Structure formats: structure tokens, C-alpha cells
């Protein structure tokens, strides 16, 4: 009997269909238990009997609370600042400045620091706002290009950045003969006056050509045999012409009277570059020295600048008269102040990146701290500088000798004259320095460039003994009339006689 019970228990275990003691309930058991729910209470039963005859309006078991909707308009109390108007660097500076002691400064020093801040930052730090409520972000300074400008600026693209489709003649408007012009890279032999008179130095003579009437006049001829004219420069306002000679003289001529007013001798070598700053005439010599002449007084030589070891072949005053740029055969570019500092006449900046002689020197007319320079055959580069920070803003390989650079304020462009191998003039777009056009026609290297007073015509003197006039910056009639009205309203700044 015991054996039968043992076999029966063994058989039931092997079948595996009997419930396992203390095992968790099966899934179907759990579902059935959940569907049955808790035992109904009397209150819940009464409510169920009261609503048994009503059709449910929603899915059973779903909450009858009102659905939340998104408001049609956001609240008016949320402030989102413009990123372009949040100047974090200025904010950090202003916050840290509060903890510093206030050092009293003279009004002159404050004005000087304000000018530096405007040139470096593009805005006045003292008047800058950290966060500003505004409808549109402020425009970038004119001539300034960055990738964020496209993203944050909502204003129309300025004319300097907009692509132009103007017609640029590829042929010169007029060709004049320039016999016996000296083929010397270091000389500055042409200049155009505000009275629309072009002065050209041909060996030992200076000729004047009136662009208005076409008349030609010989102003002077050197007295000593072997002497020649090495530079010419018109005063900005007036009828006076400065002439530099190979005999180290600087002559001053009254063009209307065709009379030499004075002969200034302070250099020891030929004078290859001249430039005016009101009544101050600056002259650069082969000795490497720059002299300032006050043409109003008898003792004209008022300053000597010694920053070059070889000939000074490029000399330009800034439009505001605060800086003088000089380029030399020693591959240097110096930026000088208009007045001596505590240490005397010391350059504010010295640029050494050029690998050749620097004759092409030109200041930007609408940005007084921007300077363009061009190198000779060993360098062949055009470089744009910020003279306040000393940074090189851009550099472009011109693939040939750069003899001269001019700025066009009408179209925000530059034009440069070149030597071998194509002897061409090249127009560049600023600040991208993209090539706009090439003007070819000279059969020898270009020596000098000068621009007409209306800014529409460029005259190029070359070693092929020709003077070519290019109307490459012609204005439309409306803009020309506006410029003529502005020019007529200006009065002359020269009220003192030159003696």
C-alpha cells in the first residue's frame, strides 16, 4: 500500500500540472482580480444606481476635468534682450571699473582716450549700454565686415558692400605726351590741385596742364645744368606749388603770378617726396630724414624726423592732420604724430612686414586710422593697417611692383599702379580686397598716380613717356550735383600770406 502511494505522488510530480504551493499567482489570475475591483461600499452603490440610466458623455474611467489649452498670446512681462546689443566685454569693463580709484585726468587726455576708443572699438565705451531695449540691432561701423553682421543686422546692406554693376572704361579717356620724364621709382613727379590743374615734372622743368581749358604752361626750368625736379606737391587750398629738386632744395611757387616765393635749403640730398598739412610742408630726402617747414615764418625748418636709414620715397599726411606716414627704401613704414611727445619725434608705429621699398602710401579718406601701403619688386604686396592698434588688417599679393595707391571715397575702392610685367592699374574693393578691374595700356612701368579733385579721374605717369587719364570713378549726375554743392559751401582755410 505504501508503495502505491509513493508511485501516485511521483506520478503527480512528473505531470507538472498541479498548483505549486507558495507560488505567485498566474497572470490570468491577476487580471481577473483587477477586473473584479474592490468590494462596493454602500455609498458607491447608491451613486451607481442613481446614474445607471444616463449615457456617459466621455469614455468611462476618464477624468471629466477641463482640458488645458495653450494661450494665444505670450505674457507681456517677459524680457528677452538682443544678443547684438549685449556688449559683454564692455559690461565686464564697466563693472570692474567701479572698484578702481578715480584718477583725475585733464580734458585733453580724456579727449585723446575717447578718440582712441572710437577708433579701436567703433563706439564710445563711456556711453555704451550693457543691455538695451531696441527694435533693431545697431549697424556695424562703415567698412567693417564680419560674419555675424549678416546674422544680426536687419538694416539694408550699405553701398560699400553692395555689388556694383557700373561700367568702368578699359581705355584711357585721354593720352598726353610726357617727354623726358625720369624713369626713377623713388620720385613723385605728378600732382593734381584742387583748382583742376595737373603739375608734371619732366626732367629739369615743371609743366602745368589745365584740365578745364586744356592750356599748357611751363612754370619753371632748373638753372643749373644737371639738376632735375624730383617731386611736386600742391597745397590743399590755394595756388601754391612745392617743388623738390635734386640739389636738395625745396622751392615754393605762386602759380597765378608764376613767381618763386622762396627757396628753402635744409636737406643734404635730393628731395623725392613732399606733402602738405595746412601751412606745414613736410619733405623727405635721400638721406632718410624728414623735415617740417613752416612756410609762414622766416626760420622755416621747425622739425627733423629721423626714422629711416635710406631714401624716403613715400610721404602722406592723414586727412585729419594728426598722423604722418612715411615709406622708405629701407622697407619700413613709420607713422609719426603731428606734434612731438615727451621723448621728442618718435614714431607711433613702425611696420616691418614689407620686403621691398615702400613708395605707395595712402590714407583712407573715411577712416582716419586706416593706412594702405605697397611694396616694391622684392615685396609686391598691398597691406592695410590699423595705425592705432598696429594690426595688419589685410594683405594681398599684387604679383608686381606697387608704385602708387589711391583711395576712391565714392565707391569705397582702391586703385594701384604697377610695374613689370603688365604695367597695369588695378581697382580693388575695400575691405574684401577683391579685384574689380584691370586697366592696361602702358608699355612701361607706372611711376606715379594722382586723382582729380572731383575724384572721378585718375592720371597715371609711366616710363613710356605718356600720361594717361582714366575715368574709372565717374559719378552719376545726382551724386555729382550734391558734391558740387558741398564743395561750393567750403571756404578756404588759408588766410595768412606766405612770405
Curated annotation (Swiss-Prot):
Residues 61-72 have a biased composition (Polar residues). This is Cell division cycle protein 20 homolog. It comes from Sus scrofa (Pig). WD repeats lie at residues 182-221, 224-263, 266-303, 307-346, 353-395, 397-438, 441-480. Its main location: cytoplasm. PANTHER family: CELL DIVISION CYCLE 20 CDC20 FIZZY -RELATED, CELL DIVISION CYCLE PROTEIN 20 HOMOLOG. The modification Phosphothreonine is found at residues 70, 106, 157. GO terms for molecular function: anaphase-promoting complex binding; ubiquitin ligase activator activity. The modification N6-acetyllysine is found at residue 66. The keyword Cytoplasm applies. Pathway: Protein modification; protein ubiquitination. Residues 20-81 are annotated as: Disordered. Component of a complex with CDC20, CDC27, SPATC1 and TUBG1. Interacts with NEUROD2. Interacts with dimeric MAD2L1 in its closed conformation form. Interacts with BUB1B. The phosphorylated form interacts with APC/C. Interacts with NINL. May interact with MAD2L2. Interacts with CDK5RAP2. Interacts with SIRT2. Interacts with isoform 1 of NEK2. Interacts with HSF1 (via phosphorylated form); this interaction occurs in mitosis in a MAD2L1-dependent manner and prevents PLK1-stimulated degradation of HSF1 by blocking the recruitment of the SCF(BTRC) ubiquitin ligase complex.
Amino acid at each position: 500500500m505504501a508503495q502505491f502511494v509513493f508511485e501516485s505522488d511521483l506520478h503527480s510530480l512528473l505531470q507538472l500540472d498541479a498548483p505549486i504551493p507558495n507560488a505567485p499567482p498566474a497572470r490570468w489570475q491577476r487580471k481577473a482580480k483587477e477586473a473584479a475591483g474592490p468590494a462596493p461600499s454602500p455609498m458607491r452603490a447608491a451613486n451607481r444606481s442613481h446614474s445607471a440610466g444616463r449615457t456617459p458623455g466621455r469614455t468611462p474611467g476618464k477624468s471629466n476635468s477641463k482640458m488645458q489649452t495653450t494661450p494665444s498670446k505670450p505674457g507681456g512681462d517677459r524680457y528677452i534682450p538682443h544678443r547684438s546689443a549685449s556688449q559683454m566685454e564692455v559690461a565686464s569693463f564697466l563693472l570692474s571699473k567701479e572698484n578702481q580709484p578715480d584718477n583725475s585726468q585733464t580734458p585733453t587726455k580724456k579727449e585723446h582716450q575717447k578718440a582712441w576708443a572710437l577708433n579701436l572699438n567703433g563706439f564710445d565705451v563711456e556711453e555704451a549700454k550693457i543691455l538695451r531695449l531696441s527694435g533693431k540691432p545697431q549697424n556695424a561701423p562703415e567698412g567693417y565686415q564680419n560674419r555675424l553682421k549678416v546674422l544680426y543686422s536687419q538694416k539694408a546692406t550699405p553701398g560699400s558692400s553692395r555689388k556694383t554693376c557700373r561700367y568702368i572704361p578699359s581705355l584711357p579717356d585721354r593720352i598726353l605726351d610726357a617727354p623726358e620724364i625720369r624713369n626713377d621709382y623713388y620720385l613723385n613727379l605728378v600732382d593734381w590741385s584742387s583748382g583742376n590743374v595737373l603739375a608734371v615734372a619732366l626732367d629739369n622743368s615743371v609743366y602745368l596742364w589745365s584740365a578745364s581749358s586744356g592750356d599748357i604752361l611751363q612754370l619753371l626750368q632748373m638753372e643749373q645744368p644737371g639738376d632735375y625736379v624730383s617731386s611736386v606737391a600742391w597745397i590743399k587750398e590755394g595756388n601754391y606749388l612745392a617743388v623738390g629738386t635734386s640739389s636738395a632744395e625745396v622751392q615754393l611757387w605762386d602759380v597765378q603770378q608764376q613767381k618763386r616765393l622762396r627757396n628753402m635749403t635744409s636737406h643734404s640730398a635730393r628731395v623725392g617726396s613732399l606733402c602738405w598739412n595746412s601751412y606745414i610742408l613736410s619733405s623727405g630726402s635721400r638721406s632718410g630724414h624728414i623735415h617740417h617747414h613752416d612756410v609762414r615764418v622766416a626760420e622755416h625748418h621747425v622739425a627733423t624726423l629721423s626714422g629711416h636709414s635710406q631714401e624716403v620715397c613715400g610721404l602722406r599726411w592723414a586727412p585729419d592732420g594728426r598722423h604722418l606716414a612715411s615709406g622708405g627704401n629701407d622697407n619700413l613704414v613709420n607713422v609719426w604724430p603731428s606734434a612731438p611727445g615727451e621723448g621728442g619725434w618718435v614714431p607711433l608705429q613702425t611696420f616691418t612686414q614689407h620686403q621691398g621699398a615702400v613708395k605707395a602710401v595712402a590714407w583712407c579718406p573715411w577712416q582716419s586710422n586706416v593706412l594702405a601701403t605697397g611694396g616694391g619688386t622684392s615685396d609686391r604686396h598691398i597691406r592695410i593697417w590699423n595705425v592705432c592698434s598696429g594690426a595688419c588688417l589685410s594683405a594681398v599679393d599684387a604679383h608686381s611692383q606697387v608704385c602708387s595707391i589711391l583711395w576712391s571715397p565714392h565707391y569705397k575702392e582702391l586703385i594701384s599702379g604697377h610695374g613689370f610685367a603688365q604695367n597695369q592699374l588695378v581697382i580693388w574693393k575695400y575691405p574684401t580686397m577683391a579685384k574689380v578691374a584691370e586697366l592696361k595700356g602702358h608699355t612701361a612701368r607706372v611711376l606715379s598716380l594722382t586723382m582729380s579733385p572731383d575724384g572721378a579721374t585718375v592720371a597715371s605717369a609711366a616710363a613710356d613717356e605718356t600720361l594717361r587719364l582714366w575715368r574709372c570713378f565717374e559719378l552719376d549726375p545726382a551724386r555729382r550735383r550734391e558734391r558740387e554743392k558741398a564743395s561750393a559751401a567750403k571756404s578756404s582755410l588759408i588766410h595768412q600770406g606766405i612770405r
